[in-house]
Amino acid sequence: MRVLGIETSCDETGVAIYDQHKGLLANEVYSQSELHADYGGVVPELAARDHVRKIVPLISCTLNRARLEPKNIDGIAYTAGPGLMGALLVGATVARTLAYAWKIPAIDIHHMEAHLLAPMLEKKVPTFPFIALLVSGGHTQLVSASNIGEYKILGESIDDAVGEVFDKIAILLGLKYPGGALLSKMAQKGISKRYVFPRPMIDRPGLNFSFSGLKTCTVNTIMSNSHDAQNCADIARAFEDAIIETLAIKCRRALNQTGLKCLVISGGVSANHALRSYLLKMMYTLQGSLFYPRPEFCTDNGAMVAYAGLIRLKAGLFSDLPILVRPRWSLEDLPRIKQSL
């Protein structure tokens, strides 16, 4: 079975083709970063309009890259949520239209499940059950994954998502949007512990996160100090250290509470090298394993959607429902299936 995956939940247009036996055949991503840079964040209306302009040419490009024709595609998977309503509707409409024209099934995919399964695209893959830390611009969640479709949200951010805070602080430090990766690069030049920021909610029971207080503390520090290169780097280092240590403490707590030894990190922020290094050391001391996708599969992409779609289509979970998207959609609402690959 070959599945065409379409991702349009936010500001990346992603299209990929995944083959059950040969793996990933093609993966194309168009980023709207430059389009939204002047606004300091994603503008939903602009995002949707740009998806409309780019998605059909990108599908043609992906088919050509894989040297395939529509008749060689057995199913279509598309991100139906969570995400921006207008952006989601573009991908869903195109996917359902092509499925009808090509006479093949289509399946709606949960964006965060696709991220959770992204490490499965690598040669070394995790096995269920495991704890997943999903960190992106819109989500910060700790999830217990017992099987595909069997998820329990152990904790999540009660305010800002990690990626969102990274981008906001990066802008205040004079970096361009999206600035998460640029902030991390700046932090490498920072002096450790010149500034020390709070690790929010680590002394409270439970696994929820809160980053609004850390954001406010960092903003106040930026505003009340000089903006020379070294000082900005020191602030970036303190901010990143606080984020990473907070995430790690909650991950360790989740592993201890569940007795699991396998941790998966995915989502855009999981590409952060400092976060990966910290968690690798932590899992080594815990005699556990850490899994994460390569950087191009951390950010939004069609490959993870195609893979998730393959699993669900093989389980017979396609539907002929009209175009439907869910801007808000919990992982816990997904149907459970047995892993069949």
Curated annotation (Swiss-Prot):
Species name: Blochmanniella pennsylvanica (strain BPEN)
Cofactor: how and how many bound: Binds 1 Fe(2+) ion per subunit.
Record-given protein name: tRNA N6-adenosine threonylcarbamoyltransferase
Binding site residues for Fe cation: 111, 115, 300
Enzyme class label: transferase
Cited SUPFAM superfamilies: Actin-like ATPase domain
UniProt record, GO biological process: tRNA threonylcarbamoyladenosine modification
Residues reported to bind substrate: 134-138, 167, 180, 272
Cofactors demanded by this protein: Fe(2+)
Entry's Gene Ontology molecular function annotations: iron ion binding; N(6)-L-threonylcarbamoyladenine synthase activity
InterPro entries referenced in this protein's UniProt entry, alphabetically: ATPase_NBD, Gcp-like_dom, KAE1/TsaD, Peptidase_M22_CS, TsaD
Domain of life: Bacteria
